[in-house]
């Protein structure tokens, strides 16, 4: 039996921990011995429930009435109601609002359109891999994992290729420490309080303004791209509001660049650190689809998602009181 003091020493909330690598040993201890673990939040009087078992995380994800994504931000940050509304995107909603937003954007993700996005992605990836192979090798991050997702997302959105570096600049600024530059609150002409902007960053203001501009262009000059579908989407006479559109555009650019870039890079590192798994892939390419899912779990760029308990509830072998926060991450759970 693992001593209680060993469990109490676990700290999965400190960013410095992840600079040394994902704490898989601690995640395993929690899964095996305390899968619904009360974790104090450093420098705060409160804390959160760290949920680490697959079945519990699936249950939380499916039960939106008990575990809300909308009650608070999906990150553990303290926001006033007006701040939360200003920053709310698809991932901070529950049904029926979540259902409405999905219906509005579904025309951009039909099977035919997804097949087109897949082919565009394959073409871009093949070109980048051909280039690094012709060069005799190189830095995988700068040659493949960094340019691939941003080139894909600008192609899908309909953003001019020459604006791709600006999209990278802005999305890098959204992640503390990624760009290495702390922005002044008034950067990019921002006058919005930072608490009303995603990531507390004026780069979000710049993404909003860019999204608004290209959205206005597509309303009068529609094209076969994702922005056109977003600005013209309508269900039962309703369309996306300005706030909904801006936050959705920001989410697509950020998720289509930073998180994907990190997952690809971390996934390649994981394969290099586990050469036997790389050999399995080379020997049996049919395993690639399963490998992608495992990379997204093991090398996830997202450390956690927050849910808020809407009532006292039993979860696994623990109890989550009403209004308490639970946090779970793909790389905390065991594979199934």
What are these regions (language model features)?
Residues 1-336:
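Cytochrome P450
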């Amino acid at each position: 039996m693992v001593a209680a003091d060993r469990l109490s020493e676990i700290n999965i909330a400190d960013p410095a921990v992840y600079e040394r690598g994902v704490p898989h040993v601690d995640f395993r201890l929690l899964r095996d011995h305390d899968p619904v673990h009360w974790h104090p939040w450093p420098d705060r009087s409160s804390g959160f429930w760290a949920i680490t078992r697959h079945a519990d995380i699936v249950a939380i994800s499916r039960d939106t009435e008990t575990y809300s994504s909308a009650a608070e931000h999906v990150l553990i940050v303290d926001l006033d109601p007006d701040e939360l509304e200003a920053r709310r995107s698809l991932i901070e909603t529950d049904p029926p609002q979540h259902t409405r937003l999905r219906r509005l954007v579904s025309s951009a993700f039909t099977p035919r359109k997804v097949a087109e996005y897949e082919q565009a992605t394959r073409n871009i990836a093949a070109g980048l891999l051909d280039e690094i192979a012709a060069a005799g090798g190189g830095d995988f991050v700068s040659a493949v994992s960094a340019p691939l997702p941003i080139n894909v997302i600008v192609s899908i959105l309909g953003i001019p290729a020459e604006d791709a570096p600006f999209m990278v600049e802005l999305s890098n600024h959204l992640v503390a420490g990624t760009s290495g530059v702390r922005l002044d609150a008034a950067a990019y002409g921002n006058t919005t309080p930072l608490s009303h902007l995603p990531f507390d960053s004026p780069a979000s203001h710049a993404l909003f303004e860019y999204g608004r501009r290209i959205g206005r262009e597509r309303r009068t000059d529609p094209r076969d791209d994702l922005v056109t579908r977003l600005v013209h989407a309508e269900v039962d006479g309703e369309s996306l509001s300005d706030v909904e559109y801006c936050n959705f555009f920001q989410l697509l650019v950020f998720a289509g660049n930073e998180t994907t870039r990190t997952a690809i890079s971390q996934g390649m590192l994981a394969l290099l650190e586990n050469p036997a798994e790389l050999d399995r892939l080379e020997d049996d390419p049919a395993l690639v689809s399963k490998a992608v899912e495992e990379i997204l779990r093991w090398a996830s760029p997202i450390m956690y998602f927050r849910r808020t308990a809407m009532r006292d509830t039993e979860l696994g072998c623990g109890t989550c009181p009403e209004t308490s926060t639970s946090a779970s991450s793909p790389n905390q759970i065991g594979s199934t």
